[in-house]
Swiss-Prot record:
UniProt similarity note: Belongs to the BChl C/E-binding protein family.
Protein residues bound to a bacteriochlorophyll c: 25
Source species, domain of life: Bacteria
One GO CC annotation: chlorosome envelope
GO molecular function, one term: bacteriochlorophyll binding
Protein name, as recorded: Bacteriochlorophyll c-binding protein
Gene of this entry: csmA
Functional summary from the UniProt entry: Component of the photosynthetic apparatus. The light harvesting B740 complex binds bacteriochlorophyll c.
Organism field: Chlorobaculum thiosulfatiphilum (Chlorobium limicola f.sp. thiosulfatophilum)
Keyword Electron transport recorded: yes
Keywords: Bacteriochlorophyll, Chlorophyll, Chlorosome, Chromophore, Electron transport, Magnesium, Metal-binding, Photosynthesis, Transport
GO BP field: photosynthesis
Cellular location(s): Chlorosome, Chlorosome envelope
Amino acid sequence: MSGGGVFTDILAAAGRIFEVMVEGHWETVGMLFDSLGKGTMRINRNAY
């Protein structure tokens, strides 16, 4: 892999940062989708 070292390092670093972000925010995202789903269900129930 001659010449592609820097790009590979950047990709690896970006992947690690992304992993940390996903790990940190996963519960928040889950709670968000949970409340979003409940809200959608409530709206659907009221619509009919």
